[in-house]
């Protein structure tokens, strides 16, 4: 038998930053959150961040593109940074 556990997450981001990211990289944040559903994604701590604990996630989105996502955990929400 194969089982999988799903965790519900809430995502947030700054709309202006999201628009700039889409113009620069061609990926909108609504698609980028698909990285969090990749079973093989990797997450490491962003050691360059001094203001808050940030993380770098590397994984594939639903279109099979490898994406790098910078994010922070704020309470119950995942805040996309870049």
Language-model region placement:
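Ribonuclease/tRNase effector modules and their secretory precursors
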Residues: 1-82
């Amino acid at each position: 038998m194969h089982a999988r556990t799903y965790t519900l997450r809430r995502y947030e981001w700054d709309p202006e930053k999201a628009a700039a990211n889409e113009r620069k990289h061609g990926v909108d944040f609504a698609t980028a959150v698909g990285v969090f559903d990749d079973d093989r994604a990797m997450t490491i701590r962003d050691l360059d961040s001094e203001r808050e604990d940030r993380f770098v996630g590397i994984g594939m989105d639903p279109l099979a593109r490898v994406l790098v996502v910078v994010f922070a955990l704020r309470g119950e929400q995942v805040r996309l940074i870049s």
